[in-house]
Curated annotation (Swiss-Prot):
This is Homeobox protein PKNOX1. It comes from Bos taurus (Bovine). Disulfide bonds: none annotated. Interacts with MN1. Belongs to the TALE/MEIS homeobox family. SUPFAM superfamilies: Homeodomain-like. Activates transcription in the presence of PBX1A and HOXA1.
Length: 436
């Protein structure tokens, strides 16, 4: 794009408004007459067209310099970031009006149609200039907001990342702490030379709160410079200084503490309290809401943290314990089941004659005979009467328990005396009226 030159009202004096049209006609038509000394060549009357006549009327109009100036400002607004403001065009309009009044020139011509066209063209360019100004302001506002957002994000990332150069990094905190600790030495204060250039006042305190000299300054090159301060010029309490020091150190280490809390690792004291409650109530490890509140008050945790811990503990602590106990001692459970109180499943009339300490046989309805090698002690007081189905189930359980213990023993017996079905020791379980 060709660079446009800044135009002003004086760029279009009288007698030169038709120069552009003349030059264009000269390039297109070599037979056209050369321009005169003033740069205006009157075209032949017979060769003019209606369009050429309209162009000449526009170029000769008194408002044409103002229209050209406004068009130039619109082009300048679109070419660079620093656009032309509408206020500057208002000043140009005032200057144009003063010049026209000073020279006694009219603002309009004899053709009302041309006057209306020029006024509307100036209004359109004026609106266009205002819109360009708004767009320029929006662009500047967006750029400023975007840059501010980037700066904020970069600063926050620098603080959170804990880089060595950031002021809140652990290395920087240790350096600050050591530097502050060094300032409390009775021999003097060791500070960088840049601190004095910034106008910072550094002081050394000893017991009593009085400032004493000397003040030792160490330059970055390692040179030691001593500066004297008169005793008693500044007084400060050691307690206040120590309190301020503790506050500064707590602020510096605040990020470390917050990061530890964000990890989700509960304090050891809290886990010990909740673990103790869990094993004390292992039979029913489900705390009530009141118990949760009490535990939360003891451990300084929230109800949500306490609830989540117990959910995880039941799944990760108690469940593996139960699984391991079930897999290691399967036979122990069978033996402990026999130690339960023996429940009799036949009437008292049969049990009174069946309680004999001898080997006996149990005859089932199918006719199968099973020999019980170990005598079973019976207590008449604990006998209970049930249906034949319950008795059959109890007999099957006893048979299975005895068979698992004596797998190597033959069920027919080695020389054992088998009792007759009608013997009192043989218990015949039938669906009779006495069992109901």
């Amino acid at each position: 794009m060709m660079a446009t030159q800044t135009l002003s009202i004086d760029s279009y004096p009288d007698g030169q408004q038709m120069q552009v049209v003349t030059e264009l006609k000269t390039e297109q038509d070599p037979n056209c007459s050369e321009p005169d000394v003033e740069g205006v060549s009157p075209p032949p009357v017979g060769s003019q067209t209606p369009m050429d006549a309209d162009k000449q009327a526009i170029y000769r109009h008194p408002l044409f310099p103002l229209l050209a100036l406004l068009f130039e400002k619109c082009e300048q607004s679109t070419q660079g970031s620093e656009g032309t403001t509408s206020a500057s065009f208002d000043v140009d309009i005032e200057n144009f009006v003063r010049k026209q009044e000073k020279e006694g020139k009219p603002f309009f011509c004899e053709d009302p149609e041309t006057d209306n066209l020029m006024v509307k063209a100036i209004q359109v360019l004026r609106i266009h200039l205002l819109e360009l100004e708004k767009v320029n302001e929006l662009c500047k506002d967006f750029c400023s907001r975007y840059i501010a957002c980037l700066k904020t994000k970069m600063n926050s990332e620098t603080l959170l990342s804990g880089e060595p150069g950031s002021p809140y990094s652990p290395v920087q905190s240790q350096q600050i702490q050591s530097a502050i600790t060094g300032t409390l030495s009775p021999q003097g204060i060791v500070v960088p030379a840049s601190a004095l250039q910034q106008g910072n006042v550094t002081m050394a305190t000893v017991a009593g709160g009085t400032v004493y000299q000397p003040v030792t300054v160490v330059t970055p090159q390692g040179q030691v410079v001593t500066q004297a301060l008169s005793p008693g010029t500044i007084r400060i309490q050691n307690s206040q200084l120590q309190l301020q020091l503790n506050q500064d150190l707590s602020i510096l280490h605040q990020d470390d503490g917050s990061s530890k809390n964000k990890r989700g690792v509960l304090p050891k004291h809290a886990t010990n309290v909740m673990r103790s409650w869990l094993f004390q109530h292992i039979g029913h490890p489900y705390p009530t809401e009141d118990e949760k509140k009490q535990i939360a008050a003891q451990t300084n945790l929230t109800l949500l943290q306490v609830n989540n811990w117990f959910i995880n503990a039941r799944r990760r602590i108690l469940q593996p314990m139960l699984d391991s106990s079930c897999s290691e001692t399967p036979k122990t459970k069978k033996k402990t089941a026999q130690n339960r109180p023996v429940q009799r499943f036949w009437p008292d009339s049969i049990a009174s004659g069946a309680a004999q300490p001898a080997a006996s046989e149990l005859t089932v309805s199918e006719g199968a005979v099973v020999t019980i090698t170990a005598p079973v002690s019976m207590n008449v007081d604990s006998l209970q009467s049930l249906s034949s189905d319950g008795a059959t189930l109890a007999v099957q359980q006893v048979m299975m328990a005895e068979q698992s213990e004596d797998d190597s023993v033959d069920s027919t017996g080695d020389g054992g005396a088998a009792l007759a079905p009608g013997h009192l020791g043989g218990l015949v379980l039938e669906n009779s009226d006495s069992l109901q």
